[in-house]
Amino acid sequence: MKSKKTVLITGSSRGIGRAIAILFARNNYNVVINYNKSEDKAKELYDMLTQEGLSVRIFKADVSKIEEANALVNYTIGQFENIDVLINNAGISKPCLFTDISYEQWDEMISTNLSSVFYVTKKALQYMLPNQSGHIINISSMWGLVGSSFEVDYSATKAGIIGMTKALAKELGPSNINVNAIAPGVIKTDMLNDLSQDTMDMLKEETPLMRIGKPEDIAKCALFLA
């Protein structure tokens, strides 16, 4: 099994994570697909890729919880003996006015989008550091760079991911472990389902390519960084 590299992707049953899983599997990686609530989507993806003869596993874990994040990493090691690439993709978005953000929503956003990156990365490094090898790719957002009205909590978590990535890259570089972040613009995922057509048209006009990004665009970037 060590002849293939192994990638663990959090939140990979839908959207960007799904596209990443497909591309890596088709490029000869062992792929561990993580999901929390979207079991049907995860199984559908698993069935599709295994029917192609590809090396894929699925594992349910809420990575905002330390014990489940640890279990996910341990499962990956148990299946494939190593983690060559970790992609922290799991995240949620709940647009609303800042004054309408509840304390519970704030805590959920921080734990799901930011703390999960810490939990999974910390556990994965138990295996990467002894090998003096590895790639960590964190999925952030352009809102982590410029901020978004009605998504203050989301923007804060994505900015936190960028800060964590910069610091960790400096710390782990001497150990031959690369750490990068991808900060996508507007990508066509379920997070856009509630937007009106007028809003979508406006977003297209503000994008240099004059189109909404596709999950596959981000997957190609992740594969390049791996």
Each predicted region: which residue ranges?
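C-terminal helical subdomain
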Residues: P174, A181, K204-A226
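Active-site helix of classical SDR
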Residues: T121, T157, T165
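Alpha-helical segment proximal to the catalytic Tyr-Lys
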Residues: Q126, K170-P174
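Conserved glycine-rich Rossmann-like NAD(P)H-binding loop of the short-chain dehydrogenase/reductase
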Residues: Y29-E44
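Residue(s) in the substrate-gating loop at a strand-loop-helix junction
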Residues: S141
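Conserved glycine-rich cofactor-binding loop
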Residues: S13-G15
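Substrate-binding pocket helix/loop in short-chain dehydrogenase/reductase
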Residues: L97-F98, Q105-I110, L192, L203
